[in-house]
Amino acid sequence: MSEGDSNKTHFGYKTVEADKKADLVASVFHSVAAKYDIMNDVMSFGIHRFWKRFTIETAAARPGMKVLDLAGGTGDLTAKFSHLVGERGQVVLADINDSMLKVGRTKLRDKGIVNNVSYVQANAEALPFPDNHFDIITIAFGLRNVTDKDAALRSMLRVLKPGGKLLVLEFSKPQHEMMRKAYDLYSFKILPKMGEIITKDADSYEYLAESIRMHPDQDTLKEMMQTAGFEQVDYTNMTDGIVALHKGYKF
């Protein structure tokens, strides 16, 4: 059953009204936006750069393509795609959170990335783009925060061109028991302390750890993508499945 099929959904380990989740998630990212990049480096020990580089390589963007970096936050993927698609291409950095968009826009403009990137505040469940518009859609570490993931996947399928691909980079389920135990200890004991020290906000990082545990596992997300209409869906585990990259096509 889709999370959007009832009036309740998960916000971390809490059960909340479905129509309240977006505001609750927004408050988390308003709080951490300014230190988001620093926390990514610290809490992943820099490994998030490898995960994102693999995503870019898998996307195989070419000059002239249109790319949607959904839940793109501070623009790490957008910056790479901007160079790959060139002057004839287009990259849209979309995020539901205006604080994250502002940080991303400032960071990319400071890097001189201005000509082929646009910024759109958008809800993944109802994307404000035409049908059959993008060659590639990426959503990195954003799907778990969406209230109705099934609706979001259908919305992504709609705006993809036939032959286009969706890449979902997201925290997932470690494959081995020893890694699971170490990951739990890190997520619930160490990560909130880091958040408190760096962002002065332990609660937001407690939510982020909980939201990872509530996110569908690798095979469940694969089935969700297939149900939404994506074909040739598969996934690659990274760092023992702490993160997985799911790929699917529209035909």
Curated annotation (Swiss-Prot):
UniProt KW keywords: Menaquinone biosynthesis, Methyltransferase, S-adenosyl-L-methionine, Transferase, Ubiquinone biosynthesis
Instruction: Provide a Gene Ontology MF annotation, just one.
Output: demethylmenaquinone methyltransferase activity
| Gene Ontology BP term (one) | methylation
Q: Does the keyword Transferase apply?
A: yes
Q: Do you know which Pfam families this protein is assigned to?
A: Ubie_methyltran
Q: Which InterPro entries match?
A: SAM-dependent_MTases_sf, UbiE/COQ5_MeTrFase, UbiE/COQ5_MeTrFase_CS
Q: What is its EC number?
A: 2.1.1.163, 2.1.1.201
Q: Which reaction does it catalyse?
A: a 2-demethylmenaquinol + S-adenosyl-L-methionine = a menaquinol + S-adenosyl-L-homocysteine + H(+); a 2-methoxy-6-(all-trans-polyprenyl)benzene-1,4-diol + S-adenosyl-L-methionine = a 5-methoxy-2-methyl-3-(all-trans-polyprenyl)benzene-1,4-diol + S-adenosyl-L-homocysteine + H(+)
Q: Where does S-adenosyl-L-methionine bind?
A: T74, D95, N123, A124
Which top class of enzyme applies to this chain?
transferase
Task: Give the record's family classification.
Answer: Belongs to the class I-like SAM-binding methyltransferase superfamily. MenG/UbiE family.
Job of this protein: Methyltransferase required for the conversion of demethylmenaquinol (DMKH2) to menaquinol (MKH2) and the conversion of 2-polyprenyl-6-methoxy-1,4-benzoquinol (DDMQH2) to 2-polyprenyl-3-methyl-6-methoxy-1,4-benzoquinol (DMQH2).
Q: Any idea what this protein is called?
A: Ubiquinone/menaquinone biosynthesis C-methyltransferase UbiE
